[in-house]
Structure formats: structure tokens, C-alpha cells
């Protein structure tokens, strides 16, 4: 009986230790911080060209399906592991190398839903690596709360101020009121905020 209890405690201690190693990543995600090891994401869809230079990997994404053709270039350190190879066809928002994504970039390229999905996948990855199963719905509530504010770009005829952070509902209500009066609505960008803000 005593030995069994010792084993359970010991195993519990090991699991606890492993979870704490993943907590900085979860905290980074919940606080919407820029990761230390960043991976660029493709801003456009297209075909990949990879060239190895002394400075690093030069990854060029070309979209020739549109006129005029679009091209984006990314320099990736040789120490990073590429997630794309020469000749690959990729979508806008695809990760180009190992590392983590900057939420601001993900928001610009993948939009709000894509950013919310990325957050949930990344948070689940940390917990699942420790053998902990948590339903997505718990994280969905947190992620929804992190993304329920907008930052005002132009106030139009509303009572809102440029740069002000407001709830999305208040923004929509204020715009509806102004539009009903024939005025100019405000414009805003979605803001992903850390849970302590």
C-alpha cells in the first residue's frame, strides 16, 4: 500500500513538472505576447522558391495567377527548420519555418477566425503534450474574450475617439445609431488583447 502511494505521488510530481515547462508558452498565448522564436507566415498564396545564402534561407513566394503578379521575399536564419520547400504551392497564412507565429501578423493575414483557431490549436498542443485533455470549448470562451475589443481608426460622427479600445458591441451600436441619423460611421481594427488587460 505504501509503495503504491509513493509511486502515485512521484508520477504526479513528474506530470506537474512537465506542465510547468509548457506554461510559459500558454502564458505567452493568453497574454498575446510576441514569441521569442518567430516564424514568418506567407502574406500571399503562391509558389515557393528557396535559395540558401550566407545570410540564411531566402524564401520567395510568387503568385502569378493574378495580374500584375505578386511576390514576397522572406529571409529565414539557417538555424531555423523550413516548413516549405522549393516548388511548394502554399496558401496565404501558411507558416514558413519552425517557431511560433506573431498574433498580430496572423490577424492581418488569416483574419479573426483564423487567429482564434491558431490560439486554440497552440494552447491545446501544450496541454496535450503533457497528456492533459481539455475540451476546446473552455479555451474558446477565453479566446473569444481576448478578441471582443476593437481599436478605433477613424471616429466618423460617433462619440468614439481615435485609438480608443471599445467592446465590439458598443462599436456596432454606435455605428448603427450614427448611420440611422445619416452620419458617417467609425472604422476600427480587431484587437487581440492579453487576458489581464
Annotate each language-model stretch with its function.
Residues 2-197:
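Intrinsically disordered, low-complexity regulatory segments
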